[in-house]
Design a protein with these regions (language model features):
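Active-site C-terminal subdomain of aminotransferase-like
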Residues: 1-52
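Short amphipathic beta-strand starts and helix->beta connectors
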Residues: 54-60, 92-98
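Conserved PLP cofactor-binding pocket of PLP-dependent enzymes
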Residues: 94-110
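Conserved PLP-binding catalytic core of the aspartate aminotransferase-like
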Residues: 60-90
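Flexible, glycine/charged-enriched surface loops at secondary-structure junctions
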Residues: 33-42, 58-65, 100-103, 137
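Short amphipathic alpha-helices in soluble, non-transmembrane regions
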Residues: 85-93, 124-130
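Short amphipathic alpha-helical segments
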Residues: 7, 69-73, 107-110
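PLP-dependent enzyme catalytic core of the Aspartate aminotransferase-like
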Residues: 108-137
Length: 137
């Protein structure tokens, strides 16, 4: 595709108009949000709010703050009795999806902070998690 476009300014095969339109819209949305820096700041805020609220209900972030990426956050299981499968189902039934941990030395789960996710979404998720944790006790 690139060579064809570079050579004569045309698509090599049928133009992928839906892909180009989607990419154009994504660039418009990125610009509206303040560019890469604005998007990064939203992700970073999502991460800060998520870690703060979960810590308040007894779920600790696995990675220390200075090494934490704003993209996905890993949390340690709050207790030995914690069941990820039950937790996952509880959250999914309420419209959110999380991920199992990928570590071998400690039980963890992960929550993505990026995409079309805003602080109000993080707050709602944290309310659901708090409801689950209170029901465990």
């Amino acid at each position: 595709q690139y060579k064809g476009m570079d050579k004569d300014g045309k698509w090599r095969f049928t133009s992928p108009t839906h892909v180009v339109a989607a990419f154009s819209k994504a660039l418009d949305e990125l610009k509206e949000e303040g560019g890469v820096e604005g998007r990064y700041n939203r992700y970073k805020n999502n991460n800060l709010v998520l870690r703060k609220k979960l810590k308040e209900i007894g779920i600790e972030s696995y990675i220390e703050e200075e090494k934490q990426s704003p993209i996905i956050t890993t949390f340690a299981f709050p207790t030995d009795a914690f069941s990820f499968n039950e937790f996952y189902s509880f959250i999914k039934e309420r419209g959110f999806v999380i991920y199992p941990g990928k570590l071998t030395d400690v039980d963890t789960f992960r929550i993505g902070n990026i995409g079309e996710i805003y602080e109000e979404d993080i707050n709602k998720l944290c309310e659901i998690i708090e409801e689950y944790v209170k029901g465990m006790k």
